[in-house]
């Protein structure tokens, strides 16, 4: 958080999508790496 860089676990919207967004591919560019915690 803080940077506009999309990290694994954080959506491009700046909202923490946790595993829901990660597994759904809602991550920035559809990150194919679902985080086990979302942190």
UniProtKB/Swiss-Prot annotation:
Record GO terms (molecular function): hormone activity; toxin activity
Tissues where this protein is expressed: Expressed by the venom gland.
Q: Which UniProt keywords apply?
A: Disulfide bond, Hypotensive agent, Secreted, Toxin, Vasoactive, Vasodilator
Q: Where the protein is mainly located, per its record?
A: secreted
Keyword match Secreted: yes
Taxonomically, the superkingdom here is Eukaryota
* S-S bonds: 12-28
- Which one GO biological process term can you cite for this protein? vasodilation
One matching Pfam family, short form? ANP
Pro-peptide residues, renumbered to this chain, are 1-8
Signal peptide span per the entry?
Answer: none
Cellular compartments per GO CC? extracellular region
Against InterPro entries, the record matches this protein to: Natr_peptide (IPR000663), Natr_peptide_CS (IPR030480), Natriuretic_peptide_brain (IPR002408)
Per UniProt, subcellular location reads as:
Secreted
Q: What does this protein do?
A: Snake venom natriuretic peptide that targets both NPR1 and NPR2. Exhibits hypotensive and vasodepressor activities.
Similarity field: Belongs to the natriuretic peptide family.
Its name, as the record gives it, is Natriuretic peptide HsNP-a
